[in-house]
A protein has these predicted regions:
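TPR alpha-solenoid repeat register
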Residues: 67, 101-102, 135-136, 168-169
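Short coil turns that delineate tetratricopeptide repeat
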Residues: 23, 62, 96-97, 130-131, ...
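Residue at a conserved register position within TPR or TPR-like alpha-solenoid repeats
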Residues: 2, 34, 41, 75, ...
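Structural register within alpha-helical repeat arrays
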Residues: 1, 30, 37, 71, ...
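Alpha-helical repeat scaffolds
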Residues: 10-19, 46-56, 82-92, 115-129, ...
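Flexible helix-coil transition and linker loops at the boundaries of alpha-helical arrays
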Residues: 19-28
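Cys/His-clustered metal-coordination modules, chiefly Zn-binding fingers
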Residues: 161-239
Length: 239
């Protein structure tokens, strides 16, 4: 009831007396409650309060990826891009499935710090650890700017053989369109429209507990109400 009403303080008080909340360990769930409170504090620009609440979340669940994600957002707001980058890397270390959620922010931090070469190294390593297409596309975007669209397209083509992906194919077509003419350009445009239509109506996330599908990341599944069970969908039509 307290969860439904978003009365997180009362929810913490009750959960702290329990071993489990539903099927999930109470300490794990309480960390999420503290993250909710920290998000609320951040929205009110109460960064000191948010930091205190995040510390509590970490005490209950030391490997909480969400806690690091919120900390990264606070650090970016304050212009501390090194701290933000460290926190974002910890998000992916604690839950590699959240890598797609932090790549854009990581890149932005590296740009601010002037360390884009380090980001390229990070992406090469991430590609070996993460089965999805997101780090491949992030690296291809950088290659396109540095070495040109042909180099980026060649890189994506090589990776598509290892991890078939409609998103990857769509980006490959984008890069190829700029270098094509006549009938080849027309055919690529048709293929691009088809891939866009395939992606437009596809969910991006799925709950690992109940199977709920969605296009946005929810920290609590709207279906089964479990915490941190919604992850990116993998495979040809996913990440």
């Amino acid at each position: 009831i307290y969860q439904q009403e978003k009365d997180w303080e009362s929810a913490i008080e009750i959960a702290d007396q329990m071993g489990f909340v539903g099927e999930q360990p109470a300490r794990y769930v309480i960390a999420q409650f503290y993250c909710e409170l920290a998000e609320n504090a951040r929205a009110r620009d109460k960064t000191d309060e948010a930091a205190r609440l995040l510390k509590k979340a970490g005490e209950y669940f030391p490997h909480c990826a969400r806690e690091r994600h919120i900390a990264a957002n606070i650090a970016r707001q304050q212009g501390d891009y090194r701290a933000a980058l460290d926190a974002l890397e910890q998000v992916a270390e604690r839950d590699i499935e959240l890598l797609p959620e932090v790549l854009d922010d990581m890149h932005a931090c590296h740009v601010e710090l002037g360390t884009e070469a380090a980001f390229i190294e990070y992406l090469h390593d991430a590609i070996t650890r993460y089965a999805g297409i997101s780090p491949v596309l992030a690296l291809a975007d950088i290659l396109s700017g540095v070495e040109g669209s042909e180099s980026a397209a060649r890189f994506i083509a090589g990776e598509l053989g290892k991890r078939p992906s409609v998103r990857g194919l769509s980006r490959f077509i984008d890069l190829s369109l700029s270098r094509s003419e006549g009938e080849a350009h027309d055919n690529l445009t048709i293929l691009k429209n088809m891939t866009d239509q395939l992606l437009a109506n596809k969910p991006v996330y799925q709950c690992r507990n109940c199977g709920f599908y969605g296009k946005a990341l929810h920290w609590q599944c709207p279906g089964c109400k479990h915490w941190n069970t919604i992850k990116p969908i993998h495979g040809v039509e996913g990440d």
